[in-house]
Amino acid sequence: MVNGRLRDTSLIVDLDALRHNIQEQKKVLPENSKILAVVKANAYGNGLIPVAQTAMTSGASGLCVAILDEALELRDNGIEAMTLVLGITSVEDALIAAQAGVSLTVGSLDWLEQYHQLAQVAKPKKPLKVHLGIDSGMGRIGFTEVAAFKQAVKLLDSPEFEFEGMFTHFATADSPDENYFNQQVQRWHQFVASLAELPPYVHMANSATGLWHRETITANTIRMGISMYGQNPSGRDLKLTLDLQPVSSLVSSISFVKQLKAGRSVSYGATYTAEQDEWLATLPIGYADGYPRCMTGYKVLVDGQFCDIAGRVCMDQMMIRLPKYYPVGTPVVLMGKSGDQEITATDLAERAGTINYEILTNISNRVHRIYRQSK
């Protein structure tokens, strides 16, 4: 996809904030605990390679991605850290992972048996690193029965495998109601207790667990996802227990400004009509950039002041009402701080009827990323 370097719309990524957030989490964990930095979905929209590089120099012990292609992109850019693919990979493509030293999630005995048979023919030069997924209640992927899990562990003794880890994922760790979370913890403990010897990476904690359930962590590794990017996994349901700093800000600038006469309408559908003469500015950003079309009627920040979006958000542009004349080139903040005011990813998510995760990951590759750090 074309990257809009010649357009004044950018996602500002603060790598110092990323580093700070990792250290904030690390200092409240037991000594020798490992952090896996979750960099799937283009590092939650912030840029896979720069974020992965920063995470690995800031205390992370490894990386997590969603699909094998993301892991191979890391390898192609010289990042050789332990990298776990959290989703299911086909048995055939697992040979590629083995050669690249990429760790795969496996959630069934059948998958292991198929790879075992394939390896007898293909004879891979390296063992496949495996993390066994435990479905303790998420209902997505993983072993649900201890007996099948133990059979899988036994099969991992074969030379074509390396039993590197085991993990689960909590469905409600970001909820004030802890009942279902506690049920999942109990199921997880059953799987852990079934092994006489644990693999090097044992991880049960996601971002929410690391924030609100640290006392329950009976593992040596935590996966740091949305919290690494300075966002609250619960939205506003639970108060943050760490001093997290937002990593990304979405900014643009005024590309065109004019005085709109009373009675004139703006944008598709003519849904907004000026009641009096007013200043109107156009911004070079739209829903094709990941700024939701449903934000019509919401607000942005200009010179520390909230300004309303006028009319419908277009594919590539949008219009805003100004309190007074501002020249072309004036900065506009769509997500982030301006003066004493701020629009957060959670603010945008609430307006759009979604979660802050989706706001970040929907920012398209057409939006140029600018990375800032002090060292």
UniProtKB/Swiss-Prot annotation:
Whether Isomerase counts among this entry's keywords is: yes
The pathway entry for this protein reads as: Amino-acid biosynthesis; D-alanine biosynthesis; D-alanine from L-alanine: step 1/1
Q: Which UniProt keywords apply?
A: Isomerase, Pyridoxal phosphate
Any one of the GO BP annotations: peptidoglycan biosynthetic process
Class of this enzyme: isomerase
The molecular function terms of the Gene Ontology recorded here are: alanine racemase activity; pyridoxal phosphate binding
Q: Which GO terms describe its cellular component?
A: cytosol
Location of the active site: K40, Y268
Does the record bear Isomerase in its keywords? yes
* Alphabetical list of Pfam families matching this protein: Ala_racemase_C, Ala_racemase_N
Its catalytic activity?
L-alanine = D-alanine
Cofactor(s) needed, names only, are: pyridoxal 5'-phosphate
Where N6-(pyridoxal phosphate)lysine occurs along the chain?
Answer: K40
Q: What does this protein do?
A: Catalyzes the interconversion of L-alanine and D-alanine. May also act on other amino acids.
What is this protein's record name?
Alanine racemase
Q: What is the lineage of its organism?
A: Bacteria, Bacillati, Bacillota, Bacilli, Lactobacillales
The primary gene name is alr
